[in-house]
Amino acid sequence: MSRREDGRLDDELRPVVITRGFTSHPAGSVLVEFGQTRVMCTASVTEGVPRWRKGSGQGWLTAEYAMLPAATHDRSDRESVKGRIGGRTQEISRLIGRSLRACIDLAALGENTIAIDCDVLQADGGTRTAAITGAYVALSDAVTWLAAAGRLSDPRPLSCAIAAVSVGVVDGRVRVDLPYSEDSRAEVDMNVVATDTGTLVEIQGTGEGATFPRSTLDKMLDAALGATEQLFVLQREALDAPYPGVLPEGPAPKKAFGS
């Protein structure tokens, strides 16, 4: 089988690097790199929940996605300067939030909010899937931080790991983790979000240049799930290291009555 322009096999990921503790202030901070795509993912913890959730005793997780002006070849204006958030940005922000809420027990957070921020430093295809993959690691560190602070009712609120990958049909071949040069000419383009328990969170797919049969969809899903298995290994390896910052001290234990 002939190799792709960058030398990879069709089912081969770009080099993936997950760096924890990329910045110091958030409870979780990760730089995730899929080849030349680089995304900073942070998870910040704040007391309180949105107004519509107050009094529920449950927490919340929300996410925002943005691209730096010079993340692509041609500089783009900041959406904050334009005065409105674009439809693509809103769609990806909601996708990241949905994906991560699928793995966490919000009741265990109490009335606290975890805010996920994914900022694309450099884009070369697959920014949303890289963001989800990195944000899960940042979320895991935020959960560790909350546990150390004594703010969790369940010390293990994460039920599974979450990772995502792009997959497409390019030149008639199913390929995973598309860089921009492939993504821009793909006949079929898809993003797959999966759990490490073998289930799916979300599938976004479309025929860009042509329709495609069910058999192609099955091949794409098989390729994507094979790629996410590799990503889960990388996430676990990254999280095997100690927490990369200083953990808070939890509340002092209450004295027993009469002591």
Swiss-Prot record:
<keyword id="KW-0698">rRNA processing</keyword>
<keyword id="KW-0694">RNA-binding</keyword>
<dbReference type="InterPro" id="IPR020568">
    <property type="entry name" value="Ribosomal_Su5_D2-typ_SF"/>
</dbReference>
<dbReference type="GO" id="GO:0000049">
    <property type="term" value="F:tRNA binding"/>
</dbReference>
<comment type="subunit">
    <text>Homohexameric ring arranged as a trimer of dimers.</text>
</comment>
<keyword id="KW-0548">Nucleotidyltransferase</keyword>
<feature type="binding site">
    <location>
        <begin position="126"/>
        <end position="128"/>
    </location>
    <ligand>
        <name>phosphate</name>
    </ligand>
</feature>
<dbReference type="Pfam" id="PF03725">
    <property type="entry name" value="RNase_PH_C"/>
</dbReference>
<dbReference type="GO" id="GO:0006364">
    <property type="term" value="P:rRNA processing"/>
</dbReference>
<keyword id="KW-0808">Transferase</keyword>
<dbReference type="GO" id="GO:0016075">
    <property type="term" value="P:rRNA catabolic process"/>
</dbReference>
<keyword id="KW-0820">tRNA-binding</keyword>
<dbReference type="InterPro" id="IPR027408">
    <property type="entry name" value="PNPase/RNase_PH_dom_sf"/>
</dbReference>
<dbReference type="InterPro" id="IPR001247">
    <property type="entry name" value="ExoRNase_PH_dom1"/>
</dbReference>
<comment type="similarity">
    <text>Belongs to the RNase PH family.</text>
</comment>
<protein>
    <recommendedName>
        <fullName>Ribonuclease PH</fullName>
        <ecNumber>2.7.7.56</ecNumber>
    </recommendedName>
</protein>
<feature type="binding site">
    <location>
        <position position="88"/>
    </location>
    <ligand>
        <name>phosphate</name>
    </ligand>
</feature>
<dbReference type="Pfam" id="PF01138">
    <property type="entry name" value="RNase_PH"/>
</dbReference>
<dbReference type="GO" id="GO:0000175">
    <property type="term" value="F:3'-5'-RNA exonuclease activity"/>
</dbReference>
<dbReference type="GO" id="GO:0008033">
    <property type="term" value="P:tRNA processing"/>
</dbReference>
<dbReference type="GO" id="GO:0009022">
    <property type="term" value="F:tRNA nucleotidyltransferase activity"/>
</dbReference>
<dbReference type="InterPro" id="IPR050080">
    <property type="entry name" value="RNase_PH"/>
</dbReference>
<keyword id="KW-0819">tRNA processing</keyword>
<dbReference type="InterPro" id="IPR036345">
    <property type="entry name" value="ExoRNase_PH_dom2_sf"/>
</dbReference>
<dbReference type="InterPro" id="IPR015847">
    <property type="entry name" value="ExoRNase_PH_dom2"/>
</dbReference>
<dbReference type="InterPro" id="IPR002381">
    <property type="entry name" value="RNase_PH_bac-type"/>
</dbReference>
<dbReference type="InterPro" id="IPR018336">
    <property type="entry name" value="RNase_PH_CS"/>
</dbReference>
<comment type="function">
    <text>Phosphorolytic 3'-5' exoribonuclease that plays an important role in tRNA 3'-end maturation. Removes nucleotide residues following the 3'-CCA terminus of tRNAs; can also add nucleotides to the ends of RNA molecules by using nucleoside diphosphates as substrates, but this may not be physiologically important. Probably plays a role in initiation of 16S rRNA degradation (leading to ribosome degradation) during starvation.</text>
</comment>
